[in-house]
Design a protein with these regions (language model features):
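Rhodanese-like catalytic fold shared by cysteine-dependent sulfurtransferases
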Residues: 1-25, 32-65, 71-103
């Protein structure tokens, strides 16, 4: 049994972190096409299906809080579970995704 080790973060909480220049890494797990249409400033795009192939890149940012997001929050939950299985423990899921963030 895998214990979920991520926390949910609201859009308002994320906006405060960004405004305060907190040491965070934003990862958008949507497709490249979705990312090009709209994204959260300073985020990087690692599509969900490529996430495990980029684990080493994420290890280089282990000093940062990682915030994972997608369109509505479903793919990001899957991504968070993958990160938990890989041993990450300092990351967050953006509740309701970029849809809620852009409201």
């Amino acid at each position: 049994m895998i214990l979920v080790s991520y926390k949910n973060i609201s859009s308002n909480e994320l906006k405060k972190l960004i405004k305060n220049n907190e040491n965070i890494l934003l990862i958008d797990v949507r497709s490249e096409e979705e990312f090009e249409e709209v994204n959260i400033e300073t985020s990087i795009n690692i599509p969900l299906q490529d996430l495990l192939y980029n684990i080493d890149e994420l290890q280089d940012h282990n000093d940062k809080d990682i915030v994972i997001y997608c369109r509505s929050g479903h793919r990001s939950i899957t991504a968070c579970n993958l990160l938990a299985m890989e041993g990450f423990n300092k990351f967050y899921n953006l509740e309701r995704g970029i849809i809620d963030y852009l409201k």
